[in-house]
Amino acid sequence: MSEADPVGEKGPAEDDGEESVPFNPFLHEFEPKGLWQNARFYILGPILFPLRFLLAAVFLFLMWPIAALRVAGLTDKELSCSIRHRRTILHHLIYLLSRTMFFMCGFHWITIRGRRAPASEAPILVVAPHSTFFDPIVTVVCDLPSVVSRVENLNIPVIGALLRFNQSILVSRQDPSSRKKVVEEVKRRATSNGEWPQVLFFPEGTNGNGKVLLKFKPGAFVAGVPVQPVLMRYPNKLPATIWTWKGNGVFKVLWLTMSQFYINLEIEFLPVYHPTAEERADPTLYAFKVQKIMADALAKPATEFELIGDTPVSPLGHLKVALDPKIWELGNILKKAGFSLDSVQGLIDLCLEGVCSRVGLDELAEKLGVTQHDVISRVFNYFNKDAAGMIDFREVSLVLAAQDATRSAEELAKLAFDLFSTCDADGRSLLSADGFASVLRSLLGSPPAESGKVFTELYTYTELQGLTQDGFVRFAIRHPCYRHLFLFYLRPPSSGRRKPPQIQQNGGCSGKNNPGKQSKMD
């Protein structure tokens, strides 16, 4: 992009004709429309839902004692080996009850395409897309394979018994070494030449709306053994089964699903994929390749959207950006608490004059004029604390400034530079790596490691000990990838300019830019 390219006060003059994948694959909301749909869900629903739910619950609880009998009396040593050939009559009973339970929910027919490979050929099954809590029905089609689950789930009635029944691999969030043990156990079972039952993974790690494939996590691929991709499709006229991070709740999805006469489900087994030597050595590359194969078969985009903690994120170059910036949430709760944006400039001036730097909870409440303890605590906890439990008030001022829809993207970038730049020995104002990280952390929530990669990329083109104001503004306004952050992503919702960052399939930046090979800025 040259200096002559039109850049308006609030963003580019045009959207460059770029298309992005759906903005939020973690969002799905469905409401019945029309007379027939409303009749189905609100007239048939009160009849079908209670009956189906009750019958499904009965068959679920019938599995409890049978699953417990499978492992009753077995020692830890015996359970460390496969018990797939022991007490097989109980396995068949659980299989029958499982299929009946899903039948009661409305899954009367399951269309199966392809052939499931035996454990000796494909010790691991990877299933996608993961779009609903009904997806475990695939375990019935796959003859009740083992799964990876949290150890806390052992304490859930019925579920815990079923996890013990199929010798699931358990991971503990409290044990730092647990993930390493899980990896070793997956490798041990996967290389047992079919002695153990197959291990089934949902490699996306969470539910999406099914319109794209989320980023595959490498856990299913660390063993470096062949895997069999398994596709799930719900070819129904109404997307009632989908349950995502944000949207229809559990009860509503159950009601909408069980109010239909029946639910269509297709499960397709793709050919077993044998990794190359390079892919065996790199689980991330292996996961990427399998994701691409499954995406092509589904005719859906393969993306790097993922859920980190409780935050849905999308990739933009070296950064992982929250789909819904938390700074708008902070602005909303402060507004409800009576805080006015009219006072922001005064707070900014104090920071520029060096009057205030680090503040505690009480001092933050005093400066913002907010007395509600719960509100000020949420705001305070958003920012990084130092060893003394203090936060940088410059970060607070920058976040508050971003709430102002009248402030242009360029003005916000210049303010960020002024707040966090320092003078070098020659008196030049420069933005250091730490200052750059503080800007991205406060506005985007980006970890320092990610910010450091971006800074290193930009710093390559200068001999100074940091970025000049012009260099930082070019990054914010004209960089072929990251400009979308300041021009669109960080525009307040009230400005009407809020858009997702332009994201390509499988991550990267918009246009022709690859996150690993960014072109030099103009």
UniProtKB/Swiss-Prot annotation:
Motif HXXXXD motif positions after renumbering to this chain: 130-135
Residue stretches spanning the membrane: 43-63, 92-112
Class of the enzyme per the UniProt entry, highest EC level: transferase
SUPFAM superfamilies documented for this protein: EF-hand, Glycerol-3-phosphate (1)-acyltransferase
Gene Ontology molecular function: 1-acylglycerophosphocholine O-acyltransferase activity; 1-acylglycerophosphoethanolamine O-acyltransferase activity; 1-acylglycerophosphoserine O-acyltransferase activity; 1-alkenylglycerophosphoethanolamine O-acyltransferase activity; 1-alkylglycerophosphocholine O-acetyltransferase activity; lysophosphatidic acid acyltransferase activity
Keyword Endoplasmic reticulum: yes
Enzyme Commission number, as recorded: 2.3.1.23, 2.3.1.n6, 2.3.1.121, 2.3.1.67
The keyword Cell membrane is assigned to this record: no
Any one GO BP annotation for this protein: phosphatidylcholine acyl-chain remodeling
One GO location term (cellular component): endoplasmic reticulum membrane
Pathway connected to this protein: Lipid metabolism; phospholipid metabolism
Residues bearing attached sugar chains per UniProt: N166
Subcellular location: Endoplasmic reticulum membrane
Keywords: Acyltransferase, Endoplasmic reticulum, Glycoprotein, Lipid biosynthesis, Lipid metabolism, Membrane, Phospholipid biosynthesis, Phospholipid metabolism, Transferase, Transmembrane, Transmembrane helix
Reactions listed under catalytic activity: a 1-acyl-sn-glycero-3-phosphoethanolamine + an acyl-CoA = a 1,2-diacyl-sn-glycero-3-phosphoethanolamine + CoA; a 1-O-(1Z-alkenyl)-sn-glycero-3-phosphoethanolamine + an acyl-CoA = a 1-O-(1Z-alkenyl)-2-acyl-sn-glycero-3-phosphoethanolamine + CoA; a 1-acyl-sn-glycero-3-phosphocholine + an acyl-CoA = a 1,2-diacyl-sn-glycero-3-phosphocholine + CoA; a 1-O-alkyl-sn-glycero-3-phosphocholine + acetyl-CoA = a 1-O-alkyl-2-acetyl-sn-glycero-3-phosphocholine + CoA
Origin superkingdom: Eukaryota
Ranges annotated as biased composition (Polar residues): 502-522
Region feature (Disordered): 496-522
Membrane topology designation: Multi-pass membrane protein
Role of this protein: Displays acyl-CoA-dependent lysophospholipid acyltransferase activity with a subset of lysophospholipids as substrates. Prefers long chain acyl-CoAs (C16, C18) as acyl donors.
Family (UniProt): Belongs to the 1-acyl-sn-glycerol-3-phosphate acyltransferase family.
The name this protein goes by in its record: Lysophospholipid acyltransferase LPCAT4
Gene this chain is encoded by: lpcat4
